[in-house]
Amino acid sequence: MGLSDLSKTPGQALGDMVQLGNVESVIQWGRSYSLWPYPFATACCGIEYMSTACSDYDIARFGAERPSFSPRQADMILVLGTITYKMAPVLRQIYDQMAEPKFVISVGACASSGGMFHTYGVLQGVDRILPVDVYVPGCPPRPEAILDALLKLQTKLKTQGLEARRQEVMQKIQELNERNKPLVVR
């Protein structure tokens, strides 16, 4: 974890202190270790996220220590808990306000599939309104599972180019907009 990760990218090494490579690999490395999370907590998964951010698990080791409470200053949203149909347009609006490139982690059974709340008022999976990058299983998931999701997202950021990421997200959003016209507020 560090500059030694750059040695896995195409380029030349000049001694121990200098690494030559392309700019995109440096940007991908930097972006993967400087995520600004926006926790959207509505249930018990939010409590597990709080313990993940505290000293016992220390999410700061992975570069996501600064939670942002303004979507305009965040690039990763963690959906933690049950999302109702009344909340869905608000969540989508928050996602649209986030800085590019933006990432989504669906934490827990309620956010991923509606959980035990299979009712008319609960959205059966946040992937119906947002392009989810990583799913975290559990009810509630343990802090280790949330950290594992963060590591999976970092791996994805290191391997996927910026343009490929942009195209993937735009395609997912277009599909979501076509499927869920009543949920999307513009």
Curated annotation (Swiss-Prot):
<keyword id="KW-0520">NAD</keyword>
<comment type="subunit">
    <text>NDH-1 is composed of 14 different subunits. Subunits NuoB, C, D, E, F, and G constitute the peripheral sector of the complex.</text>
</comment>
<dbReference type="GO" id="GO:0050136">
    <property type="term" value="F:NADH:ubiquinone reductase (non-electrogenic) activity"/>
</dbReference>
<keyword id="KW-0830">Ubiquinone</keyword>
<dbReference type="GO" id="GO:0015990">
    <property type="term" value="P:electron transport coupled proton transport"/>
</dbReference>
<feature type="binding site">
    <location>
        <position position="110"/>
    </location>
    <ligand>
        <name>[4Fe-4S] cluster</name>
    </ligand>
</feature>
<dbReference type="GO" id="GO:0005886">
    <property type="term" value="C:plasma membrane"/>
</dbReference>
<dbReference type="InterPro" id="IPR006138">
    <property type="entry name" value="NADH_UQ_OxRdtase_20Kd_su"/>
</dbReference>
<dbReference type="GO" id="GO:0005506">
    <property type="term" value="F:iron ion binding"/>
</dbReference>
<keyword id="KW-0411">Iron-sulfur</keyword>
<protein>
    <recommendedName>
        <fullName>NADH-quinone oxidoreductase subunit B</fullName>
        <ecNumber>7.1.1.-</ecNumber>
    </recommendedName>
</protein>
<keyword id="KW-0479">Metal-binding</keyword>
<dbReference type="InterPro" id="IPR006137">
    <property type="entry name" value="NADH_UbQ_OxRdtase-like_20kDa"/>
</dbReference>
<keyword id="KW-1278">Translocase</keyword>
<comment type="function">
    <text>NDH-1 shuttles electrons from NADH, via FMN and iron-sulfur (Fe-S) centers, to quinones in the respiratory chain. The immediate electron acceptor for the enzyme in this species is believed to be ubiquinone. Couples the redox reaction to proton translocation (for every two electrons transferred, four hydrogen ions are translocated across the cytoplasmic membrane), and thus conserves the redox energy in a proton gradient.</text>
</comment>
<dbReference type="GO" id="GO:0009060">
    <property type="term" value="P:aerobic respiration"/>
</dbReference>
<keyword id="KW-0004">4Fe-4S</keyword>
<keyword id="KW-1003">Cell membrane</keyword>
<feature type="binding site">
    <location>
        <position position="139"/>
    </location>
    <ligand>
        <name>[4Fe-4S] cluster</name>
    </ligand>
</feature>
<feature type="binding site">
    <location>
        <position position="44"/>
    </location>
    <ligand>
        <name>[4Fe-4S] cluster</name>
    </ligand>
</feature>
<feature type="binding site">
    <location>
        <position position="45"/>
    </location>
    <ligand>
        <name>[4Fe-4S] cluster</name>
    </ligand>
</feature>
<dbReference type="GO" id="GO:0051539">
    <property type="term" value="F:4 iron, 4 sulfur cluster binding"/>
</dbReference>
<keyword id="KW-0408">Iron</keyword>
<keyword id="KW-0813">Transport</keyword>
<comment type="similarity">
    <text>Belongs to the complex I 20 kDa subunit family.</text>
</comment>
<dbReference type="GO" id="GO:0045271">
    <property type="term" value="C:respiratory chain complex I"/>
</dbReference>
<dbReference type="Pfam" id="PF01058">
    <property type="entry name" value="Oxidored_q6"/>
</dbReference>
<dbReference type="GO" id="GO:0008137">
    <property type="term" value="F:NADH dehydrogenase (ubiquinone) activity"/>
</dbReference>
<keyword id="KW-0997">Cell inner membrane</keyword>
<keyword id="KW-0472">Membrane</keyword>
<dbReference type="GO" id="GO:0048038">
    <property type="term" value="F:quinone binding"/>
</dbReference>
<keyword id="KW-0874">Quinone</keyword>
